[in-house]
Amino acid sequence: MSEKNDTLVQVEHLKKYFPIKGVKGPGVQAVEDISIEIKRGETLGLVGESGCGKTTLGRTILRLIPATEGQVMYNGEDILTYDKKKMWEMRRKLQIIFQDPSASLDPRMTVGEIIGEAIDIHKLAANKKDRADMIKGLLARVGLNTEHANRYPHEFSGGQQQRVGIARALAVNPEFIVCDEPISALDVSIQSQVVNMLEDMQHEMGLTYLFIAHDLSVVRHISHRIGVMYLGTMVELAESYELNRHPLHPYTTVSYTHLRAHETDQY
């Protein structure tokens, strides 16, 4: 396969500024001139301190918020130029797993309705039985039971809620998923289960991830390559093992120093 075909997402000089009311100028520069590529089937980890722009970058790539400038090439086409109809069709391929599952799930809907909504919107089921079978399969895929379809989000633990969020993202059979700090709101005992599940799904379904987190130990475990953001810019991008061995930017060096000290304290 050629290098061009290996690249699923190509971000070129992407910028996102948020205007400040009553203040002239570009405003808050949340994402500043970022260019990255994400290869088909890989996990690109994205780390940085709170407020560095990593979540904004992920949402801008998905066009959940509009870009100020730049390009987002998906399979060689700039999706930032798509009209509403074409972008709606593209939504099946692009999904997101949110940080806080309790806030991202509609409390008035059952789990079956939440997962089934995406199936209905994109008309993926031939009939009611097909729809029910799809929901059942998605629940099983994330480690939940068929009976859970009739329950509401508040009846689940945080880890179970996040599994519902993952099932919802998978419902449309996507190619690319932005995982926006998907385990930061979960208990430590549950985090590894969710990460392992995401890895298994990637291998089985050929998924491509942009995995956003502030916990370097998690990102190091799941990612093929890691990008480091600082004040809206990408200050470092390297293979996971190489970044671990030879961090170059001061922020990355300090982050790995703290991680190694924490790992040493545990033994």
Question: Which residues are covered by each model-predicted region?
Answer:
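ABC transporter nucleotide-binding domains
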Residues: 1-247
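Conserved small/polar residues in nucleotide/adenosyl-binding loops
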Residues: 52, 257-264
